[in-house]
């Protein structure tokens, strides 16, 4: 069953009519609904084009959070072969919000790290809705250290509203863990490619996203805080999230123009949730091109370029 966003009502109405006509044709074979269904399908496509060609930042935020949008586990199943997950931080516990491990990407050994939100009540609770605790970031550090030791390129897939802000997480050193993970990303002497596949929220995202190349899916978002959080702080009114989203410059187009990201990966018509296989394949192509481009560079070059990239970003914004 498709989950429709509020602004997709014209699409849901048309697709609802198509479902009704198909059901009618099934119940009574003497009724031919083929032509009408064809006309409605054309109108559906036109409605999707019209709506998705002029999404505002708040609508893009909703698309980035769509429950049927492909998550890390979907990319891992399709993009990688022999994915072997790593568990635990060897200090406190396991954190399923961060998924990390070794894999093959188009025949090449790589290290993989990303956030997983889950797609139903059970898995969302298991993965803490994609909000990592300190042990998750320390697990990410483990895989980054391993990648650096064995010369494995790192691929990170970012999808989090932010690091978990609970008391226990703070007591166990959340800020330190995020800082160490960011430092490790900046310090490895291997290629590091990061892709924001949904939400890129605050330091919780940056901790695994300081790559040589950083990309965003067309309808993903990347920001220092959620629009609701910004509205609550600025105006003490979370209902002004739409206004905050516009002012914060959180879309892929905004961040590309500001020089924060290196490129935008186009999504299928209607968003990644309408054709997950297509967007996952496109993401794989972009990652492969980025790794190929960096293949001849030395470890020192890669590290220095990455550090300089983010230093320049801080100076120029």
Curated annotation (Swiss-Prot):
UniProt record, GO biological process: fatty acid biosynthetic process; malonyl-CoA biosynthetic process
Keyword Lipid metabolism: yes
Main location: cytoplasm
A GO cellular component annotation in the UniProt record: acetyl-CoA carboxylase complex
Locations listed in the record: Cytoplasm
Domain CoA carboxyltransferase C-terminal: 40-293
Disulfide bonds, paired cysteine numbers: none
UniProt key word Amino-acid biosynthesis: no
Gene Ontology MF: a single term: carboxyl- or carbamoyltransferase activity
Pathway of action: Lipid metabolism; malonyl-CoA biosynthesis; malonyl-CoA from acetyl-CoA: step 1/1
Family affiliation: Belongs to the AccA family.
Subunit description: Acetyl-CoA carboxylase is a heterohexamer composed of biotin carboxyl carrier protein (AccB), biotin carboxylase (AccC) and two subunits each of ACCase subunit alpha (AccA) and ACCase subunit beta (AccD).
UniProt cross-references to PANTHER family, sorted A to Z: ACETYL-COENZYME A CARBOXYLASE CARBOXYL TRANSFERASE SUBUNIT ALPHA, ACETYL-COENZYME A CARBOXYLASE CARBOXYL TRANSFERASE SUBUNIT ALPHA, CHLOROPLASTIC
Function field: Component of the acetyl coenzyme A carboxylase (ACC) complex. First, biotin carboxylase catalyzes the carboxylation of biotin on its carrier protein (BCCP) and then the CO(2) group is transferred by the carboxyltransferase to acetyl-CoA to form malonyl-CoA.
Protein name (Swiss-Prot/TrEMBL): Acetyl-coenzyme A carboxylase carboxyl transferase subunit alpha
Protein species of origin: Rhizobium leguminosarum bv. trifolii (strain WSM2304)
Top-level taxonomy: Bacteria, Pseudomonadati, Pseudomonadota, Alphaproteobacteria, Hyphomicrobiales
Gene: accA
